[in-house]
């Protein structure tokens, strides 16, 4: 196990507990291990931090450990849920670490059902899943070797989308997790490692290109575990500073943890951090050239201390992140178009095409300059014609800079599927027709996935059907679904339906058998009587002499006696 996801509580604002100590030590001893925790759902509680209700209410000392990741609950549009627990940690450190969607998340229930849930317990596994994707990316880039978890935490924190006050804060931590930005850091090798001892300095050279809108630089280290109930959990204290080409020096973000609600809600400033085991420097519109990041071993009683430095360079480019191609959208539904872009002074223009870019249609020509999403009502029709297309794309433009879906996606309605019957030998599936569909793909649950069973060409009727051979006659129940297709583009599958065999309504497969009566006369005429079962409806007799019959009980005359 290298990534865990856990959402249990253990006290509110419990401080640096023995469990926090154990987890910090465990992560330090197992270099690839990452523990992800929910921050808690006590956002409105007063847990004794000293600032009243709404602050210092992370639910468990283990979630306040230095080397773990604690996750806040965000809505679909990146707002903090009111119930999401907030920092600081008991000693003033930044918690939670990052946020992710945890509001109105669909999840499974017993008896093959779903429901919607809200809480940091829903956000936490999302972050663990994001970590798994980044771990896999690192392995593919580095000879299938697991990454060091201190690097991965540094990547995730430094690439998060800033929310709330500029820089880190005690509500959102370092922002909303952004896997695409994290992947970019790994793919472009925008990280370095170092090792430092008491009182020493280490320099890292960074070349910042022209046109950079913002640079974020972070240094993170898995800190040695502190003693249980330590008033200050940080053991090895590193400090960073950034020197520009002109010689000016920038210090990292710091927050004031004074137990006062107004102070805790104050934006971060730049200064010296002696509480946290991560430090970040942000510069907007930096002068291009060579920068020097200096890491100082201010207090390293247990050295040498390994650390990682990551940097993220943001330009004026726009990256459309959804829809990017291959999706199946439904006419009339709302979809969040999403993109990554650095703040600018120009609004965005959003457009869509349903004919592979021949014609573009305005969605909105004045989307806010700081927006990164737009709630789009997928069109039901265009110029009075119902929309059913496999040639749709979205385009976003700002001040002459543009990006669009990497490939076409499909817009088509969803059929309503049901199973008429399922028998040991065959299955009969029916569904409602969809406007504009050229054909339909019928799927059945295999060992892991919904496997395509057949494709049925649209017949133009209001209902469609498929008769399938049953590949699993001994399975007690099966799951089926259908999606509409427009040429090669697939729409969304209908929610799968469960069907169980009902042998009482299934006809048994016919088994051929017959009885031969004695010859009626010396002429060789023989009477055959059908003795088959399974409700046969058609017969084909072969008398062995080149003659056949379609009668149920035929008579046949042989010229000479012979075996039949």
Model-derived segments and their meaning:
Residues 468-491:
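Beta-strand-rich modules
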Residues 339, 425-437:
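Conserved aromatic anchor
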Residues 377, 383, 467-472, 552-564:
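Solvent-exposed segments in extracellular or luminal domains encompassing
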Residues 502-564:
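Extracellular/lumenal mature domains of secreted and surface-exposed proteins
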Residues 174-236, 244, 303-332, 343:
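Secreted peptidase-domain scaffold signal
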